Amino acid sequence: MKSPALQPLSMAGLQLMTPASSPMGPFFGLPWQQEAIHDNIYTPRKYQVELLEAALDHNTIVCLNTGSGKTFIAVLLTKELSYQIRGDFSRNGKRTVFLVNSANQVAQQVSAVRTHSDLKVGEYSNLEVNASWTKERWNQEFTKHQVLIMTCYVALNVLKNGYLSLSDINLLVFDECHLAILDHPYREIMKLCENCPSCPRILGLTASILNGKCDPEELEEKIQKLEKILKSNAETATDLVVLDRYTSQPCEIVVDCGPFTDRSGLYERLLMELEEALNFINDCNISVHSKERDSTLISKQILSDCRAVLVVLGPWCADKVAGMMVRELQKYIKHEQEELHRKFLLFTDTFLRKIHALCEEHFSPASLDLKFVTPKVIKLLEILRKYKPYERQQFESVEWYNNRNQDNYVSWSDSEDDDEDEEIEEKEKPETNFPSPFTNILCGIIFVERRYTAVVLNRLIKEAGKQDPELAYISSNFITGHGIGKNQPRNKQMEAEFRKQEEVLRKFRAHETNLLIATSIVEEGVDIPKCNLVVRFDLPTEYRSYVQSKGRARAPISNYIMLADTDKIKSFEEDLKTYKAIEKILRNKCSKSVDTGETDIDPVMDDDDVFPPYVLRPDDGGPRVTINTAIGHINRYCARLPSDPFTHLAPKCRTRELPDGTFYSTLYLPINSPLRASIVGPPMSCVRLAERVVALICCEKLHKIGELDDHLMPVGKETVKYEEELDLHDEEETSVPGRPGSTKRRQCYPKAIPECLRDSYPRPDQPCYLYVIGMVLTTPLPDELNFRRRKLYPPEDTTRCFGILTAKPIPQIPHFPVYTRSGEVTISIELKKSGFMLSLQMLELITRLHQYIFSHILRLEKPALEFKPTDADSAYCVLPLNVVNDSSTLDIDFKFMEDIEKSEARIGIPSTKYTKETPFVFKLEDYQDAVIIPRYRNFDQPHRFYVADVYTDLTPLSKFPSPEYETFAEYYKTKYNLDLTNLNQPLLDVDHTSSRLNLLTPRHLNQKGKALPLSSAEKRKAKWESLQNKQILVPELCAIHPIPASLWRKAVCLPSILYRLHCLLTAEELRAQTASDAGVGVRSLPADFRYPNLDFGWKKSIDSKSFISISNSSSAENDNYCKHSTIVPENAAHQGANRTSSLENHDQMSVNCRTLLSESPGKLHVEVSADLTAINGLSYNQNLANGSYDLANRDFCQGNQLNYYKQEIPVQPTTSYSIQNLYSYENQPQPSDECTLLSNKYLDGNANKSTSDGSPVMAVMPGTTDTIQVLKGRMDSEQSPSIGYSSRTLGPNPGLILQALTLSNASDGFNLERLEMLGDSFLKHAITTYLFCTYPDAHEGRLSYMRSKKVSNCNLYRLGKKKGLPSRMVVSIFDPPVNWLPPGYVVNQDKSNTDKWEKDEMTKDCMLANGKLDEDYEEEDEEEESLMWRAPKEEADYEDDFLEYDQEHIRFIDNMLMGSGAFVKKISLSPFSTTDSAYEWKMPKKSSLGSMPFSSDFEDFDYSSWDAMCYLDPSKAVEEDDFVVGFWNPSEENCGVDTGKQSISYDLHTEQCIADKSIADCVEALLGCYLTSCGERAAQLFLCSLGLKVLPVIKRTDREKALCPTRENFNSQQKNLSVSCAAASVASSRSSVLKDSEYGCLKIPPRCMFDHPDADKTLNHLISGFENFEKKINYRFKNKAYLLQAFTHASYHYNTITDCYQRLEFLGDAILDYLITKHLYEDPRQHSPGVLTDLRSALVNNTIFASLAVKYDYHKYFKAVSPELFHVIDDFVQFQLEKNEMQGMDSELRRSEEDEEKEEDIEVPKAMGDIFESLAGAIYMDSGMSLETVWQVYYPMMRPLIEKFSANVPRSPVRELLEMEPETAKFSPAERTYDGKVRVTVEVVGKGKFKGVGRSYRIAKSAAARRALRSLKANQPQVPNS
């Protein structure tokens, strides 16, 4: 459209092109298609890029608005031409010369060139010095440097003296070249050029060609002159002409508004009053000293503002502004101290009130009266009416706009804010983010000159909208330059103002408001959408302001309207002519300008005649591209290619004229498009047609290669043509809620039973196998751990032991340890004899004894379980063995079994009566190896004791330890009414028989193999030597049990042994299955081979130093103990304690257990937040036991109030109430072989969530030793038969496989986390390499989409499930009484339900838990977050070592669990009530039992009776990161209520419940296990066998295929899992022959260079200078194209021979991740999983990579043409140089400490990190896929960092803050700042708010966190912002 610009139009004739009236219909160019994609021209590229093109093409003078683009163009041009200057100067190599005007500019240019290139730069700024140099001296300089930067005077001297001739210069750059017009050395230098035959390329840079008002003629002359002098063409940047020189120009209209006639005379009256007042103030000639403030200043300002508003907008607005000013004045008056000033302010105040009064006489201020506004305003409203959307009347009515009911719109009180619009705004509009296309079709800006004009005009428009339905659609806002300026000092008030402005811009960008009234600030630099209406309310006064405001009208159809008063219109016309002329001159200079007018084809003509459209399926009207739409398609396609925030990829089109006057175009797509060749179109009659036709041809090509889909739209990454990669699986149908693959979704699986133990019950007269369970004490318990000074009993000292009788052979498995009270016992399972038969009687006897062991000795029988060996899944028998008649051969001990059958004490208590006549006779030998039973109490389940010692010096008449009784005899008489017949028998010191049946891990170590804290040795010694702490029994009152103590001690180990055996066999079976499926390892092991022992990778010798006596609860060493550690005590009861694992991943811990490791073991430290006063009504001793025993430390709290900070609550040595049952809460209950202290993940990862010192806890178990052995490739020396075999060939050690199957929740001595991490990174590497090699044409976006699909948890979970892993996994703590099914037992369906409730002992246990589950927890009550509990009534249990450890832990967990209502059969989630100071636990069903009295004896408790937990709510279980029972997590208000209403009930003995994600983790861990044991090829084959393709398949013939049924469908989860496994093994044994040939090896993609006529020459040009880089990294590329590709950014279109670096970066990223992870994994320090994770994320991240890239000069070789990227890199490099040392962890390094207010973190250019990765990918490909080579190059670069971080693991600021302030830190959502960045505020409740700004949410968030941390650490709490 030609602008009907210059003739003033009357409004009547004004035909606006509004979107509604436009012929294209209202949908065209709607503003919310923010970055509208151009449809008729190619997407324009950045102007600096176009200027660079021009400069490369010919001599150019670049006219820029600012200095910013100048260096970019100069440096890039130098780099592009640098191949000419790398040569030797003596052999006519050339040099580049930069000329600057003054010495101080030299350094600036030097640093720019040095930063961005590796060229050698010489600087010459001092004429005096340089003038004296000789030719030789200069020659040295020229030889040494390639770029010479000199002041013009030095240069002139050098050239004139002929030291350097112009023909030696390839490029001459003139900075500030406009000086050449004057008489200046520049001119002289150019004169020298005139006679020079080979003149250098010339680049002139100027920013000041246009300053202020200037005459177009002069300007033109100036430019021409300059062009002539510099022999160049001037090119202007688009920021001097309308910004987007391609879009259709806005339609420019000048509107004459006519004169203002005011009939009422009010206008004149007000004007007169104001002028008088102003004159009066001006006349007050108060002498103003320069030092003092001018008293009249404020008054003058206010009155003149008021006058201006009156003149521009009229009386109605003047009244409004007077109202606002009165309010503002009140503030000044209030604060003004000085009398004179105050008088002036009061004068002004009165005067403004007078104005208001005058106005009120004429109109009511509440409604808008258009008689009292100026014609300009009226015209403006008319224009706005035309923009009213013409469909769907806004919401049927205008109510929503008119609900302001103030009678008086301007309130005169000072209580209101200076613009109450802000507040009203919120109320008056409902949510306006509806997407109706017509809501905000207007997107307009009105430019005004003064701030007040903007404020009042906005108010006026809102008022008009209320009264005129035509204007109701407008939602306006104003923005004034106030406070947006970059560098004013900010105070709080300005900050607030600034935020307000930003909010306004945000709403405008989001099109929540559709009209912005703005002062000139918005002309420049502010990021706002393309507008379709720009109104200049006040006329522009200079060219720049004209162009910039016009440049805001960038929507495809837009109007630029200038409102002029009649008197101004003449002079403005002149100005406008000038502006137009200047614009025209500059536009001609604008590179590549296409003057739209002439070339426009008449749109009516049917273009299809010119060139036929490309149509798909012509018959049924399929999609088509026509010559008119083709360009739009190409633009859209380019916009979808992957790129970074700095590069907007656009096509490049060159049009040339042929001699016959026709034109043809060549189209180049961005270099990461698969369509690489340029496309040449046919000759056409005009430029525009040529461009369109070539686009059409290109669309056709793109569609043919699959880049456009069948709707001719760009193919997204999802619509992959690589379907086979995404092997689309049917989503399994389950009723289980939750997203597949996530932690939230859990399902139940049967526990696997190893094939060799299934149906293994021996039958009479059938061959049997007899295995011996060998037990040898390998590491006796060291003295410092032997608290009771107990004698150690090595199991090998007694010959009688246990064996296993089974019908099937058991494969060889590694020996493994169990940990008894005597220390570490190594268990072996050795075949004794096979093929023998047994009679029925013998078998029955054996079976009875087997049942006796489990039901009576171990007391594992319960109503839910029934002994049915014939029905049981696994029913081998356990039986006693002994040596046969003094030989050393073991055999079945039938005699012993018969003796037991006969014994009276076998089950109950024998009823021997002693009398005076037949007194008791004491025989010492009977008591030497005995278990005794007190006969006088607990008749139903008598307690059993080992005899520890016989006190021959004590008798029943000795003194009783406690004062209540004189002697032992008196005690028994008084208490039990028992008389003794023998008063000189000795007394017995006894120990409880062990109730702790989980012996898988040592209990003095935590799960990491670190010692738990002990109390001091003296205290312990004193305690154990005092009789008070011993249990003393009288032999006469006890019966002797038929089972000797030595055998009993072995029996206690049976559950752990059988369980571990079971797990190892499951693992062995998986190893064998993988051997046949994947061809990795052998199916069955050689007979003479046994794997190295299973061990936890802990040091064998537990050296005494590791037991640290803790004397200060928060001492430094404390960090080594898990902050929330718990102790595994020796009775079953407390095994649960360790299950704190459930706390995994809780950022919010409700209990601060930091001080639980307290100095005196009998006390519990509870940290209570200081405001927890709810507790004080409670006196602690009231609930402690008052039994008959005494405690060594009975310091009860006397007060009834907790001291605020660390109060100790005594906890008595706990009776063992089986907390572990509760714990099955984890409900992945499985006979898991695990009993360790605390989930690793929890421990190290988040242990310090609730500690305030933020130091990570470094205590985690390293991978099992065999991992190390395998890595180091050495075998254990004791395994002599294994020499000659290795796990590389046989397959991984079952112990390692077991580790990979064990979750941290199982609390075993090992878990899968380290392996999982290694597997995770190898998986990423394997898949990445596969995709990279298989799809050489796919760009990075597609590759990473395919990768993310393959490695997603959801996919891995599916594959793991298909492989049958869930049944084999070990997911919960091994807890024999709760979730272990002894051999021969079955779960009795009928009884199991009742069993869970009607257990006699249960109520006692319940009593111990005064917990309460409160269904309706309303409040998130942060103060009372600390859990408090009363110490429940306790029983002392002298059997166990708790006193030595901290019962608190145990107690804390018990209470936590009990309080959690874990007994309820189905629990739906409900958070805990912490409002009560103690929990009361409401008993389900039997609440009346709550009052049952306790007997006060200390030995009357049964540990094994707790079955309550068979029904659990898995949604509550904690496996990875779900909620812990009883923990309320304030960050999730709904606390998972929605996720967890499902309750799954399942049987703990035979099933387990697993979260999908854990299965995915397990797959990764197995991969890690195969990788460490068998190497990379094996790991790849393993992946292929899972169904993850990472190797190419070699096609086999169909016949072979028929032989190999698909191995997909084996092992689904039926009960008969192993049956199908057997089938699988048969089926796959045939195929294993073909295995290795089935998968080939990956081939390197053949071409890395495109076919190109002179590719090699181009390559050499492009990589000139790279040899220096190769030297630096110490690697020479064989194929240099990889090197070029690695450094080519997508914006670098000069590289036509290779791809850009994105694909290599995709590859390199995975390679570095894997190499670094592998290096960390293999570190001899054996980092724990949490530390590994932290180290990995600290080392594998963009910041580190970018910093290293800069350190090793990658940036100097980087090839990109992107101005923004150039600046970011520039900043970053400068920053790195200043800092000069590497930064940890954080993706944004900080600039300066001072600039606190709005700290911007320096941005790390992602591109730098990318090329660091892409180079790794390039080396990998170039070296023939050798990881070693990559590591040789990269390890030296990374080593210092790896060392530094390993020594001191960095954490991300966000994580550190959350760990430091888990409850109180809250991050705000992102806000946009006015320049388009993101701001995040983090509020630390009570400590202040901290803001961070950055280009993305992540960057901003970490900036905010960093500032918060800095402030918290400096410990000066900021004043919280209101």
From Swiss-Prot:
ATP binds at residues 64-71. Changing residue 960 to A: 2-fold decrease in activity. Changing residue 971 to A: 10-fold decrease in activity. The keyword Oxidoreductase does not apply. Binds 2 magnesium or manganese ions per subunit. Changing residue 1036 to A: 5-fold decrease in activity. Changing residue 1340 to A: No effect on activity. A motif (DECH box) lies at residues 175-178. Double-stranded RNA (dsRNA) endoribonuclease playing a central role in short dsRNA-mediated post-transcriptional gene silencing. Cleaves naturally occurring long dsRNAs and short hairpin pre-microRNAs (miRNA) into fragments of twenty-one to twenty-three nucleotides with 3' overhang of two nucleotides, producing respectively short interfering RNAs (siRNA) and mature microRNAs. SiRNAs and miRNAs serve as guide to direct the RNA-induced silencing complex (RISC) to complementary RNAs to degrade them or prevent their translation. It is linked to Pleuropulmonary blastoma: A rare pediatric intrathoracic neoplasm. The tumor arises from the lung, pleura, or both, and appears to be purely mesenchymal in phenotype. It lacks malignant epithelial elements, a feature that distinguishes it from the classic adult-type pulmonary blastoma. It arises during fetal lung development and is often part of an inherited cancer syndrome. The tumor contain both epithelial and mesenchymal cells. Early in tumorigenesis, cysts form in lung airspaces, and these cysts are lined with benign-appearing epithelium. Goiter multinodular 1, with or without Sertoli-Leydig cell tumors: A common disorder characterized by nodular overgrowth of the thyroid gland. Some individuals may also develop Sertoli-Leydig cell tumors, usually of the ovary. This is Endoribonuclease Dicer.
